[in-house]
Regions:
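Short, basic, alpha-helical segments at the C-terminal edge of helix-turn-helix-like DNA-binding modules
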Residues: 33-34, 62-71
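Amphipathic alpha-helical packing segments from all-alpha helical-bundle domains
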Residues: 111-136, 144-148, 152-155, 182, ...
């Protein structure tokens, strides 16, 4: 009996998640009401309140679930100084993004939640910044610029990739970003110090 209940709960939460993603394409989270959401997914308000106190509670759970999936991908393939190591990490991250394409697209879209983007930036910084500083100790005074360049380029790519209806595969996206970052690292290594 418990498995049946779990399946229904998962189905309801998936419906709410997908409904929120659809509404976030039209308006910000702060403008979305519980009534709009439950009408969108055709469930009762009482069912919504059984799982969440409000829209923010739903959003919080979604963002935490996505963050945990990204953290898991990083734990399974930690970023190290070896060049070839980053590719597997990127493959896993792009698979997480692809598996959650609709909600991630809404979160990073024009009506999205900046807190989610900042949370992703913190996760990536916590797991990659130190490695870059170890790889380029002589470039520590330029590291902020290089890191911002790579991070914002990757985030821009992700937004474009998510918005593209005929999007390339997660594997291609990971390979593309991997090659761009490695190429940028080589160029960074060759930059001269400011005079």
């Amino acid at each position: 009996m418990q498995k049946k209940t779990d399946r229904r709960v998962r189905k309801t939460k998936t419906q709410l998640r997908n409904g929120l993603a659809m509404l976030m394409k039209e308006k910000s989270v702060g403008e979305i009401t519980v009534k709009e959401l439950v009408d969108q997914v055709d469930i009762n308000r009482s069912t919504f309140y059984l799982h969440y106190p409000d829209i923010s509670g739903l959003l919080y759970e979604i963002e935490n679930d996505l963050s945990e999936e990204m953290e898991r991908a990083i734990r399974e393939h930690p970023i190290e100084k070896r060049e070839d190591n980053g590719f597997h990490f990127l493959q896993d991250i792009f698979q997480v993004l692809d598996n959650n394409r609709e909600i991630v697209s809404a979160l990073v879209g024009p009506y999205g939640d900046m807190r989610f983007i900042q949370k992703v930036e913190v996760i990536l910084a916590r797991n990659s910044r130190e490695v870059l500083e170890q790889m380029f100790p002589e470039k520590s005074d330029q590291m902020d610029y290089f890191y911002a360049y790579c991070l914002n380029g990757c985030l821009g790519f992700v937004k474009t990739w998510l918005a593209d209806k005929k999007s390339c595969t997660p594997e291609f996206a990971a390979d593309f970003i991997y090659r761009m970052v490695v190429s940028s690292m080589r160029a960074f290594c060759e930059t001269r110090e400011e005079v």
